[in-house]
Every structure is written in structure tokens, then in C-alpha cells.
Amino acid sequence: LASYSFLLEHFYIVDETTSMTKQELNGIKLVKTDLSAKLGKGEPLVLIYHTHGSETYKKVNGQEGSVIEVGTALQKELETVYGIKTIHDTSVYDMVGGQLDRNAAYNFAGDSVKAALKKNPSVKVVIDLHRDSVESSIHLRTKINGKSTAQIMFFNGVSRLAKKGDIGYLYNPNKEGNLAFSLQMQLLCGKYYPDLTRKIYIKGY
């Protein structure tokens, strides 16, 4: 984990539109970052939302699921199994007046997240849960305990463009914590559920 090249080879995909430094992807420092949080007395610790809530999955046995349903399942798991009170925002931000607008959705969702955090200062983890988009012939799945399971990917937006540098209006004071969170989650998934995760994807936005 101390090797930058090792991290890039085994853990990360850095999109060509952005860049990362060796100081930022310091694996030892990231895994040692203390991200522990105490469970509050009935206070929410996690917020799940969907910038692109209209995303759906390929039909299986005639049924089509949505990414919002995945969020509902995750909320149930966190609360019933782990006792982590979770807020799930089921708003569809990418449909405006009946028209699909994936870009404007980030502004709408961002405003709602800010309001939710102001109302619920106990929240420590915010998850923007998406469905990936790939060719229909590609099946990104593995087997967990003999059951076919979709692979997941952790995604970090680092507010930086390769050619223009840091994006000032998108300054993120939590960038280092987010990078630590995704790497620690990646390592835990690898420990308990090998092959569940794809490489962490890093992009400018």
C-alpha cells in the first residue's frame, strides 16, 4: 500500500480527465485514517440518495428494478442488521418536467443533501448510489456464497481536471476522508467478499 504504482495497478482507475498525486494516494495514510463513528441514540448516521433516481436495471424474469429499490434494500440492511439509523431520500432528481436531465440533477440533489445535513447534523456518511451503465453483453457479477451477485464500485470525485487543475467552485474539504473511506471499504470487501468490488474509480467531478 506504500507503493503508488501498486495502488494504481490493483486498486484504482484514474480517469484521463483528472490526475492524482502520490501524496493524495498514500495508501498507508489512508488506511490509518480513523473513520469510526459512535451510534447515536436514534439519530441517523447515514444518508442515501440518488442523483440519477430514474436509473433502472435490465429486466429479469419480466421484472425491472430501479436504483432507488437498491437504496431501500441497503437502508433496511443497515438498520435491521447493524442498527445504523439511515435516511433514504427517494426523490428522482434527473427528471425535470417529465424530461430527463442528468446534468442538472447534480444541482438539485446537492441542494437537497445540504438541507438534509443541516437538518440532521448527526449524519457522518453520505452515499450517492448509482447504477452503472455498460453494454448489454457485459455482465459484471460474481458469486457470493454460491449466489450470483452484481459487483459494486466505489467512486471518488476529486474536484480536479487534468488540464485545468483544481475546480475552485467544487472545493471539497472532505476529499481526503472520502479517499480513505473508499479504500478502507475496498479492503474490507476484499477480505470478506473477494471479487465483489471492481477497482475504485477516480474522476474529476
Regions found by a protein language model. Give the residues of each.
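Non-catalytic propeptide/linker segments at domain boundaries
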Residues: 1-47, 57
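Extracytoplasmic
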Residues: 41-43, 81, 121-124, 147-151
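Soluble periplasmic/extracytoplasmic beta-strand elements of cell-envelope proteins
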Residues: 45-50, 125-130, 153-155
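Acidic/histidine-rich, surface-exposed loop or edge segments in extracytoplasmic proteins
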Residues: 50-61, 89-96, 156-157, 162-170
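Catalytic-core regions of hydrolytic enzymes
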Residues: 61-74, 78-141
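A short, glycine/acidic-enriched catalytic loop
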Residues: 135-171
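Active-site-adjacent mobile loop/cap segments within catalytic or ligand-binding domains
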Residues: 195-205
